[in-house]
């Protein structure tokens, strides 16, 4: 059937595809092709063909849509990474695991206890220290050093069978320390009241100071302090007036009236200097002393250690001019 003879049929929507037939030879040797053979056009029923074609198209479109969706999902999943779930550390399970590991290590290597310590401390291996054993010479040197330190410590205890000096009965010469110890021992025997290493305190009544008017000060218990110090009032009065740089006198009530304003602290400081210089012994610091005057010098004699030493004479200090200079010059002339 040629192309000119083909008639357009509007009822036909689609034509079936022609099946290709293989090239066949007839018995006569004439080759027949599909074009030479007369083909009868069969009218296709419209209804069944249209339904089949529509269904086929729908299936193809569904498959394409499904494949497109799968591709989109795969692409989306590649972009999104899954979050790793954090494993919760269980202490009980870890302890059980450590115990199991301990048991296995004990069974396999019972002679190495360091592996157990490594497991307990988070697999941290300790460095092995090389233990050095000291020699006998080092031990002897340490013992001698300890003995020297013990001998240096003075605990007041000494063990000796000797009653006399340490050098007695031997040809060796005595040392300075031995002589010094002998001197202190003799002092303790002669003076049992004295205790070596302790300072004797001199206790005295505080001075009573009263303000008299606006320009004078009264030392109330002056005579009582003179009796406690075993000193003459004239000597103490001269020292007080010289140190304070003023003038004063003793009234009828045996009170020292000093010209000027003075506080109790100032008089206490003056009395402390007087006691240190003219009362206490310069050798043993004992207050049991006697002040004697020989020719023009004063001597301090101790009744405890029987020492005798000279003391400085009282000198008047600087005195400021308080009155009018014209009146002083007139009196002098």
From Swiss-Prot:
A GO cellular component annotation in the UniProt record: synapse
Q: Which UniProt keywords apply?
A: Acetylation, Cytoplasm, Initiation factor, Isopeptide bond, Metal-binding, Phosphoprotein, Protein biosynthesis, Ubl conjugation, Zinc, Zinc-finger
Residue spans of biased composition, Basic and acidic residues class: 40-51, 96-105
Region annotated Disordered, chain positions? 1-120, 139-165
GO MF terms listed in the record are:
mRNA binding; translation initiation factor activity; translation initiation factor binding; zinc ion binding
Q: Sites of the modification Phosphoserine?
A: 2, 13, 67, 158, 218
Zinc finger (C4-type) positions are 281-305
Reported function = Component of the eIF2 complex that functions in the early steps of protein synthesis by forming a ternary complex with GTP and initiator tRNA. This complex binds to a 40S ribosomal subunit, followed by mRNA binding to form the 43S pre-initiation complex (43S PIC). Junction of the 60S ribosomal subunit to form the 80S initiation complex is preceded by hydrolysis of the GTP bound to eIF2 and release of an eIF2-GDP binary complex. In order for eIF2 to recycle and catalyze another round of initiation, the GDP bound to eIF2 must exchange with GTP by way of a reaction catalyzed by eIF2B.
Q: Which residues carry this modification: Phosphothreonine?
A: 36
Does this entry carry the keyword Zinc-finger?
yes
Disulfide bridge positions per record:
none
Bias type Basic residues, positions? 13-22
Protein name in UniProt:
Eukaryotic translation initiation factor 2 subunit 2
Q: Which InterPro entries match?
A: IF2/IF5, Transl_init_fac_IF2/IF5_dom, Transl_init_fac_IF2/IF5_N, Transl_init_fac_IF2/IF5_Zn-bd
Q: Which SMART domains match?
A: eIF2B_5
Question: What family classification does the UniProt entry report for this protein?
Answer: Belongs to the eIF-2-beta/eIF-5 family.
What does the PTM comment of the record read?
The N-terminus is blocked.
What subcellular compartments does it reside in?
A: Cytoplasm, Cytosol
Task: Name positions with the PTM N-acetylserine.
Answer: 2
Q: Which GO terms describe its biological process?
A: cytoplasmic translational initiation; formation of translation preinitiation complex; in utero embryonic development; male germ cell proliferation; male gonad development
């Amino acid at each position: 059937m040629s192309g000119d003879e083909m008639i357009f049929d509007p009822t036909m929507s689609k034509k079936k595809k022609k099946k290709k037939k293989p090239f066949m030879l007839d018995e006569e040797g004439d080759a027949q092709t599909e074009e030479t053979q007369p083909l009868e056009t069969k009218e296709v029923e419209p209804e069944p063909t249209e339904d089949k074609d529509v269904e086929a198209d729908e299936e193809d479109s569904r498959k394409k849509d499904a494949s497109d969706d799968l591709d989109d999902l795969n692409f989306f999943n590649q972009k999104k990474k899954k979050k790793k779930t954090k494993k919760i550390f269980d202490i009980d399970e870890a302890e059980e695991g450590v115990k199991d590991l301990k048991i296995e290590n004990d069974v396999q290597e019972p002679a190495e206890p360091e592996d157990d310590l490594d497991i307990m401390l988070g697999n941290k291996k300790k460095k092995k220290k090389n233990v050095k054993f000291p020699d006998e010479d080092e031990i002897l040197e340490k013992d001698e050093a300890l003995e020297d330190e013990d001998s240096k410590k003075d605990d007041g205890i000494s063990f000796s069978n000797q009653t006399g000096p340490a050098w007695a009965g031997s040809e060796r010469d005595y040392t300075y320390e031995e002589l010094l110890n002998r001197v202190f021992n003799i002092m303790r025997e002669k003076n049992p009241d004295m205790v070596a290493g302790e300072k004797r305190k001199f206790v005295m009544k505080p001075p009573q100071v009263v303000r008299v008017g606006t320009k004078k000060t009264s030392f109330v218990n002056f005579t009582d302090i003179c009796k406690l110090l075993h000193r003459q009032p004239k000597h103490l009065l001269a020292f007080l007036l010289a140190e304070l740089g003023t003038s004063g006198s003793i009234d009828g009530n045996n009170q020292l009236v000093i010209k000027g304003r003075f506080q109790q602290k100032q008089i206490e400081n003056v009395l402390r200097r007087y006691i240190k210089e003219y009362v206490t012994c310069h050798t043993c610091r004992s207050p049991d002393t006697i002040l004697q005057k020989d020719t023009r010098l004063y001597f301090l004699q101790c009744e405890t250690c029987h020492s005798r030493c000279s003391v400085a004479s009282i000198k008047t200090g600087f005195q400021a001019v308080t009155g009018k200079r014209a009146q002083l010059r007139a009196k002098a002339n």
